[in-house]
Design a protein with these regions (language model features):
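A glycine-rich, often tryptophan-bearing local segment used as a flexible ligand/cofactor-contacting loop or short
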Residues: 70-144
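Short, solvent-exposed loop/turn segments at secondary-structure junctions
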Residues: 16-17, 68, 96-98, 174-177, ...
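Catalytic beta-strand/loop cores that center a nucleophilic Ser/Cys/Thr
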Residues: 5, 34, 42, 119-196
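Oxidoreductase and adenylate-handling cofactor-binding alpha/beta cores
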Residues: 112-118, 148-167, 206, 216-230
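Helical hinge/lid and interdomain linker segments adjacent to catalytic or ligand-binding clefts
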Residues: 8-98
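Proline-centered loop/turn at the N-terminus of a beta-strand
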Residues: 88-90, 168, 198
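Extracellular ligand-binding/catalytic regions of CAZymes and related secreted enzymes
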Residues: 1-8, 36, 178-186, 193-231
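Short aromatic-enriched loop/helix-cap "lid" or pocket-rim segments at secondary-structure transitions
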Residues: 22-24, 55, 101-105, 182, ...
Length: 231
């Protein structure tokens, strides 16, 4: 790591067909915000980089649509140790695909990750459409520079259960602004797990159009900067 830079982030993107366009657009986006904010970044779609030895050089890990079931048992263990050691984690969109329905044959279910996510599991989302994010907590460093609400076109992830009460909810989906699959009512879409030093989940950000959304770009930037902060 260049010692003139304050921290280094590893961004591991999904190889899933549905997310290839986002991954391709995200690489130059993250390179730009790293340069503008003076930190180092490595971007890859190779999950083999998730190992204890390699992760030692990073202060922040970003799961860009990489689902928990995309990782092997040893990769899951390495990431869990990374998070439990107090380093930063930013999970984007498909990073929240927790649930036993997704366990692959011959593999175990990563129960720790479900609890880390706030004790919720993914429920099938409605059609891609425009909706509104309501920023509930503008005191948090990740959301303090956001407007009270912003529109975004996305897959509005739904969950079995509500993380509120087990996490600090920063923003909710305004279900009156789009057609839901299974209405949640109170619908957290961005939250942090304060049981860990620096961990934030961002449920929106399905495709490259999100990277042209000013509020969303601010959210990603500030989430990474917060996840890397020492205080």
């Amino acid at each position: 790591m260049d010692m003139t830079l304050p921290f280094k982030a590893l961004i591991v993107a999904s190889r899933a067909k549905d997310h290839l366009q986002m991954s391709a657009s995200a690489e130059p986006f993250f390179a730009r915000i790293a340069a503008e904010n003076h930190f180092a970044v490595d971007f890859t779609d190779d999950a083999e980089t998730i190992n204890e030895e390699n992760l030692e050089q990073y202060q922040v890990f970003v799961m860009l649509h990489l689902a928990p079931f995309d990782m092997t048992y040893s990769q899951q263990e390495a990431l869990q140790e990374f998070i439990e050691s107090g380093k930063g984690w930013v999970g984007i969109h498909a990073a929240g695909l927790a649930g036993k329905a997704f366990v692959r044959s011959g593999t175990r279910y990563w129960q720790w990750f479900e609890e880390f996510l706030g004790g919720v599991t993914y429920s099938p989302h409605p059609a891609y459409q425009k909706g509104t994010v309501l920023v509930d907590d503008r005191r948090h460093p990740a959301t303090q520079n956001l407007p009270p609400s912003f529109e975004i076109s996305d897959e509005w992830y739904e969950f079995n259960g509500n993380p509120r009460g087990r996490t600090r909810v920063l923003a909710t989906a305004d279900e009156t602004t789009y057609k839901q699959n299974k209405p949640m009512g109170d619908h957290p879409i961005i939250w942090t797990n304060e049981g860990y030093r620096r961990a934030i989940y961002i449920g929106v950000g399905h495709d490259p159009s999100a990277l042209t959304n000013e509020a969303y770009c601010i959210l990603l930037r500030d989430s990474i900067l917060w996840a890397a902060s020492a205080s």
